Amino acid sequence: MNQANLTRFGPRVFECAQGAPTTFSATFRAIDGTAKLVLQNSGIDDARIEVNGHAVVAPQDLRTTGEIVVPLTLQPENTIEVRMAGASAGAISVRVTQLTQADLGLLRQGYFGLNTSDMARQRAFYDTLGFKGEIYPAGPETSTTFARALGFPDDYLIHVSLHSLEDPPVMPFVDTVQFRGDSYRDEPPYPDLNHIGMTYATYSTTDLDGDFAYLQAKGVDFVSAPATAPNGERFVFLKDQDGTYLKLIQAVEVAAATSSPSLVRLVNTNMNVTDLERSREFYRLLGFTESAPGSLAGAGEFAAAHGFDGPIEFEGVDISLGEGTDGATLQLRQWKRPHDDAPPYSPPVNHLGIDRINFYVKDLTAAIRTMNELGFEQLGPIGGGPGFGLVFFFDPDGIKVQLAGPRTA
């Protein structure tokens, strides 16, 4: 059983100019039970907050600045209203948290999903990178149940392939899809590495400099030459023909130079988030119980290797599934500078670039029931057949998380 302190609302910052009364209202989901409203006050001395029609914060509660914690009782559907009189200028930050327990039964990461405009070109690209295993075609060109699970109103038309560093292919794969005809969406991948959502995946190599030279000679587009991060990691970013980013890092084990790429394994899948605490707790509930710090800042070569002229800074944590799983790792990053608050791709799941992540679960029926009971938003109906299926849920930033596994009665 995993326990997490979920953010049910916020964090939202409400600013008020002197003499300009402000009212804000919203709804949010939770479960029946106790919770906390966490308020950070910066200069506001006349505000009122109601949750489900009950006054929980009054002006006398704001006589001091800093953090204020108010106990709450929540229900599945909730309302919140924030009213600031405008007697003083300032801001308040509001977050509602709720301690929650669940067992979703995650077993491993199956793949990250990448959409391409040209399947033949993309297959050749992964061959150039040194991916040895491939399943193609890896699924039917049409499927109404799968299409609706991905957010389409009816059917789609696709090519799909699964790429693996090993042959015969093993997970985690790169699930590559070319949406065709009316289901194609002609929008480019995220242009910069700080965009909210899934911007890249990281592979380790035993010969970073050799791979860089080899791939550059093959015409692969790199952001820069290999660079060294403040934590000592040597890395480089490259792009596929659509502009989707991948990252290569030097593995601890160093091998002799080879005449072809020396990729070893998928190290992590990146997720840029708007609030690190909120995302960390969401994935803790899913089973990501192990963590390591990942905050970095720097300028010069380090920033340029990320595609930026000025200094960069992000807070982060690398999280992985616990004992009894394959140790899949997610790289959560909250960018401080440069900051980009544009939201991730909207449904359906057909935007060019990395647009989804898949996890296998022990019992899909039980996992869906638990996610629905906890109030998480489901993208569409269950795709697949009576014995095995898949479904998408949104994480706190709208990143599409796919759960797949056996279905029970």
Residue ranges and their predicted role:
Residues G43-V56:
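Short, surface-exposed beta-strand/strand-loop-strand elements in extracellular ectodomains
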Residues N115-M171, G210, A217, A227-P230, ...:
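Core segments of cupin and vicinal oxygen chelate
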Residues A102-R123, K132-Y136, G197-Y203, I249-R280, ...:
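N-terminal beta-strand motif that seeds the catalytic metal site of vicinal oxygen chelate
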Residues M1-D45, Q75-E77, E81-A102:
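Beta-strand-rich recognition domains
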Residues D175-Q178, E233-A257:
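Short, structured interface segments
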Residues N41-I44, P230-E233, P386-F388:
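Short, small/polar residue-rich loop motifs at catalytic or cofactor-binding pockets
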Residues T22-A26, G66-V70, V236, V391:
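Short strand-edge motifs at loop-to-beta-strand transitions and within beta-strands
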Residues R108-S117, H159-R180, R185-L215, R234-K239, ...:
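Vicinal oxygen chelate
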